[in-house]
């Protein structure tokens, strides 16, 4: 994460079998290109044991165009961050410090969420 100091960093942990992950992924994709948020890095991290093809199909089915796929299929990062399930979103400020953790699905396009997030951007 230190490579991204100066940026707001969002780690979103998900899996292809997770219905709430499927619900929130399109709004996370839109957040990536939100013109009101600069210096924003988003890493959607698949914690399942899926192959790349299954993950790509998940993104294709949801028309995800702005995000890359990352993997933590041996759950190293998930364990380091003491994750309890998916979806979980962990937010880091520009100094690389965790400032929020969202457990469960949210709408990343929600006006109140965007207003709150802009305070850290």
Feature-to-residue mapping (PLM):
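A short beta-strand-turn-helix
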Residues: 1-9
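Short, conserved active-site loop motifs that form the nucleotide-linked donor/cofactor pocket
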Residues: 40, 67-68
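Soluble periplasmic/extracytoplasmic beta-strand elements of cell-envelope proteins
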Residues: 12, 44-46, 101-103
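Thiol/disulfide oxidoreductase modules built on the thioredoxin-like
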Residues: 60-65, 72-118
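Structural microenvironment flanking redox-active thiols in thiol-disulfide oxidoreductases
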Residues: 22-62, 73-79
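Proteins that catalyze or organize thiol-disulfide redox chemistry
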Residues: 2-3, 29, 115-121
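Conserved redox-active cysteine motifs that mediate thiol-disulfide chemistry
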Residues: 5, 13-30
């Amino acid at each position: 994460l230190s490579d991204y100091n100066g940026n707001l960093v969002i780690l979103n942990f998900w899996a292809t079998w997770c219905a709430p992950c499927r619900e929130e992924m399109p709004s996370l994709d839109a957040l990536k290109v939100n013109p009101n948020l600069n210096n924003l890095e988003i890493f959607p991290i698949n914690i399942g044991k899926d192959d790349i093809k299954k993950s790509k199909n998940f993104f294709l089915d949801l028309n995800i165009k702005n995000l890359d796929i990352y993997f933590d299929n041996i759950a190293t990062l998930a364990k380091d961050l003491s994750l309890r399930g998916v979806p979980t979103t962990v937010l880091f400020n520009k100094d690389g410090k965790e400032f929020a953790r969202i457990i469960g699905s949210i709408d990343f396009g929600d006006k109140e969420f965007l207003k709150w997030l802009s305070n850290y951007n």
